[in-house]
Amino acid sequence: MDAYTGFAQVYDLFMDNVPYDEWCAYICETLKKHGIADGPVLDLGCGTGELTRRLAACGYDMTGVDVSVDMLQKAMEKQTDPPILYL
């Protein structure tokens, strides 16, 4: 049974105080520090895609992966440009 079934519907409400913008800035800074200014990045455990979308907006070719189909469906509902592959 998917532990996140049902929880995906309220996940973003529980996570609304998470500093995703700060996390994204830190990750982008770290990637650039190591010579990765763009290109493919895999977000394992992407949940509803909040961080994934922010990283895509920074120019990374994002793929989001999550074990929960419900979380992935929520992430796909938020699909923006550039497109993100969710698996």
Model-derived regions: residue spans:
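Class I SAM-dependent methyltransferase Rossmann-like catalytic core
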Residues: 8-18
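Conserved acidic
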Residues: 19, 47
